[in-house]
């Protein structure tokens, strides 16, 4: 590390010895940084304990109604019991989860503790990554944010990929920062690699693992390359690309040889206009531009502020999207990125990496998706860049420092308060679920659907195929019975084409639930794709459909046998 780099880090951390500054009065931020530096281990372990405590208090022992979290469990189970490699949507997380499926089976609560462990690791490695590289006030603001924010903590008890990805991403940043620390511009191309070959090997391995854990992970290494391009470290660009490609090639060779070629085309699915309707075609260039800016408006003007602002409501409407706010926020981030370029290379790296990550999200996700979980992997870095930028702006003005710290403290207390309220609301459901009532907390429509899935597993032969609106959820609550999925329906279904399609899939039974379109309210509007398909069959061939079982009276779920 050069003398200039060491001086920059020392200045950035603001941890100068007070005795060396007797002639200079310490500011509020100086005093806070000095106190945090002296007590950083105590502060960190306290925050780590509280983070883990909130992970447990906010623990959600149910699967979500989205279905993706159940799908990851099903893929992990299929890998263990059927040797089917989980290529679709990234194999990294199902492969890691498969170790726990091997030990605990389909025990959802046990499997969710893997995410709790990932949250623990994410907080720990984030601290190690940024410690002594950024001001302590900024460091502990970041650790507090990822420890208490209820959106981030939500994924600490879900079998979505987010907590796992955040953990891996923190390791990737840690390795990259170690490489940045060790850069020696005077070394030759070969010598430079030899001096840090261990770090570069770990870099290649970790970034490939990140890339196979979430499709968007491929752009992460692009962020690293972009940073080295801006800082004119061209040899590091060569090392980064070669190491990533080498490990990616090795991964491809091993998986293809052991499990066969990947038949799921992630790029093709990414280009679809509608993810689950391939017949809708693919986006052209102008369509991709529209997608980018639609997602840009949605995620920056809506979801970022929902996640950052602890008093923002969880529910939202399309009218909450404010495009001008997205552009204002982007300008602010750009200004803070420019500031960090001159002040702190690790914040600057975070900004460049963030640009690459968000760019990939905005281009790679269909605009109608609108899920906040897609931006959650970028939120720690968004918070970091924003908080650091404000820190730099106020540090020369004592009055503004006081206002800044007061505002940050209030926001922290409100964030903790919001998570505490949610923990109290969660207490009854958590107690019931841990006590064995696996359906408590679901609305009647979902409870009846899941009970019907279990009935199918308990009462029907294993060889009989059952059609389900949410096959992965049926799989979990049906004790591992495989179900056939029906996510959409033809535009104008007719009896003969429906029967022909079901017969090709050997569908013998159909679960007909009344799942709400509005999860919060039973207003009579339901997700009716299976209803639209079974109705013409019933009208034309009434003798080919037989009611087998009904569960529930309100928002009931029915099971029909199809007689070909």
Regions found by a protein language model. Name each.
Residues 41-44, 137, 196-205, 242-245, ...:
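Signature aromatic-anchored transmembrane alpha helix within multi-pass, membrane-resident enzymes
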Residues 61-75, 84-99, 106-109, 214, ...:
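Extracytoplasmic catalytic/substrate-binding loops of multi-pass membrane glycan-assembly enzymes
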Residues 123-126, 305-350, 356-358:
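Hydrophobic, aromatic-rich transmembrane alpha-helices
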Residues 234-314, 320-329, 414-422:
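Membrane-lumen/periplasm interface segments of specific transmembrane helices
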């Amino acid at each position: 590390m050069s003398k200039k780099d060491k001086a920059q880090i020392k200045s950035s951390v603001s941890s100068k010895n007070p005795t060396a500054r007797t002639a200079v009065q310490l500011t509020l931020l100086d005093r806070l940084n000095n106190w945090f530096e002296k007590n950083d281990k105590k502060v960190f372990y306290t925050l780590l304990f509280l983070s883990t405590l909130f992970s447990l208090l906010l623990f959600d022992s149910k699967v979500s109604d989205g279905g993706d979290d159940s799908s990851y469990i099903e893929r992990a189970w299929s890998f263990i019991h059927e040797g089917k490699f989980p290529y679709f949507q990234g194999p990294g997380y199902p492969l890691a989860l498969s170790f726990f499926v091997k030990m605990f089976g389909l025990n959802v609560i046990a499997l969710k503790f893997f995410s709790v462990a990932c949250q623990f690791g994410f907080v720990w490695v984030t601290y190690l990554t940024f410690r002594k590289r950024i001001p302590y006030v900024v460091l502990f603001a970041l650790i507090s944010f990822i420890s208490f924010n209820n959106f981030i903590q939500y994924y600490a008890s879900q079998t979505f990929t987010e907590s796992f990805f955040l953990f891996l991403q923190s390791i990737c940043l840690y390795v990259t920062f170690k490489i940045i620390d060790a850069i020696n511009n005077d070394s030759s191309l070969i010598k430079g690699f030899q001096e840090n070959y261990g770090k570069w090997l770990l870099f290649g391995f970790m970034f490939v693992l990140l890339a196979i854990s979430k499709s968007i992970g491929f752009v992460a290494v692009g962020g690293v390359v972009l940073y080295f391009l801006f800082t004119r470290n061209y040899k590091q660009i060569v090392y980064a690309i070669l190491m990533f490609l080498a490990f990616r090639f090795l991964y491809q060779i091993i998986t293809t040889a052991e499990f066969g070629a990947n038949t799921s085309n992630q790029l093709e699915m990414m280009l679809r206009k509608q993810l689950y309707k391939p017949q809708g075609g693919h986006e052209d260039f102008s369509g991709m531009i529209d997608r980018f800016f639609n997602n840009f408006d949605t995620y920056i003007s809506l979801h970022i502020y929902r996640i950052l602002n602890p008093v923002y409501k969880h529910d939202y409407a399309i009218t909450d999207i404010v495009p001008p706010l997205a552009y204002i926020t982007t300008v602010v981030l750009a200004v803070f990125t420019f500031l960090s370029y001159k002040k702190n290379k690790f914040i600057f790296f975070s900004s460049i990496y963030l640009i690459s990550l968000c760019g990939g999200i905005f281009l790679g996700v269909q605009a109608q998706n609108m899920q906040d979980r897609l931006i959650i992997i970028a939120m720690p870095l968004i918070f970091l860049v924003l908080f650091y930028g404000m820190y730099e702006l106020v540090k020369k003005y004592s009055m503004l420092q006081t206002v800044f710290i007061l505002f940050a403290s209030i926001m922290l207390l409100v964030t903790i308060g919001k998570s505490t309220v949610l923990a109290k609301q969660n207490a009854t459901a958590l107690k019931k679920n841990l006590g064995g009532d696996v359906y408590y907390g679901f609305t009647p429509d979902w409870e009846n659907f899941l009970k019907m899935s279990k009935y199918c597993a308990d009462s029907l032969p294993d060889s009989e195929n059952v059609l389900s609106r949410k096959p992965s959820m049926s799989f979990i609550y049906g004790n591992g019975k495989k179900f056939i999925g029906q996510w959409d329906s033809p535009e104008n279904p007719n009896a003969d084409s429906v029967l022909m399609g079901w017969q090709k899939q050997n569908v013998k039974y159909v679960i007909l639930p009344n799942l709400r379109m509005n999860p919060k309210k039973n207003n009579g509007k339901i997700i009716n794709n299976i209803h639209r398909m079974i109705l013409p069959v019933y009208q034309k061939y009434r003798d080919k459909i037989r009611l087998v079982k009904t569960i529930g009276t309100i928002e009931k779920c029915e099971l029909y046998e199809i007689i070909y």
